[in-house]
Amino acid sequence: MSDLRADTAFQAPADAPQTPSGNAVFLDHVGWFVPDMEALAATMEKLGFFLTPFVAQHNADPNGGPPIPAGTGNRCAMLQRGYLEFLAAVPGTDTPLSRQLNAALDRYQGLHLVAFTIDDSEGAYQQLQSGGFTPLDPVHLRRPLTLGDGSEAEVAFTVLRVPPEMMPEGRVQMLRQETPDLVWQDHIIARDNGIIALGGIVLCVDDVDEVSSRFSRFTGKGIDGDGDYQSLSLDRGRLGFASRAALARYLPGIEAPTTPFMAAVCLQSGELKKTQQFLSEAGVSTSPLSDHASLISPIDAAGAAIIIFDENDVWPPRA
């Protein structure tokens, strides 16, 4: 395994801005697909996350008509940097996104979405085109939001998606945060568990070379390593690509029910001992990965392992 503390070239997620500028690419959020939002909420609240109210998602009609139902709805756990999203199909809907979500749940419950944020959505669209991803038309996603003073507002995102077969690992997308100040409101950011930032995600795949190369073309960022574990460092955040054997080395006890599999999300704690104490008092067990990183089992985190690391460690590690 790499000497994680020697990874000084990597900027800790909590030290980076909330949204990128120029050609920078950040890991914006990751998403769970779930069949039961109530059960999910109980699980995540036990881990110390505050969840936003459930909202059915809508796309803006390009012809100026009423909003178009996306077929899915979400709740979010906002962090000081990045966030976690939890999605379920809206009952009675039949849309491409609801069908994709239900098909993914047939494979496994857990992480199925990774979203990168950019500043230049038009430039990112052209990059996806030139990379051979045949991106779909940009989606102007809107959802209502209640502000801290009780007034209503609307948050906006420009989302770039590609046909599902282009990125079979899950719903992999680019987006521009049009209203970041509304998305990251201070009163909805949980602090009791000490977790402050989204650091990365670990994917278990059959062909590490092919998948890492494809994600490199998708993001425009380079790959480290050439074996059965490789990594891709963004301007904020990192992805790790592991074979089944590499997953067993890095995350003992975590097994992929199928491949491809988004195995773990990595979260930075501002004070690991505080996080560990909070989880222990909540009845959630953790196992040590190092002196500066702990693991929450998928059983306790709605199907995905959660790695919590502090400022002296970096997860996923650089290959």
What are these regions (language model features)?
Residues 2-28, 32-52, 68-140, 147-227, ...:
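Glyoxalase I/VOC metalloenzyme domain signal
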Residues 57-60, 69:
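Membrane-anchoring hydrophobic segments
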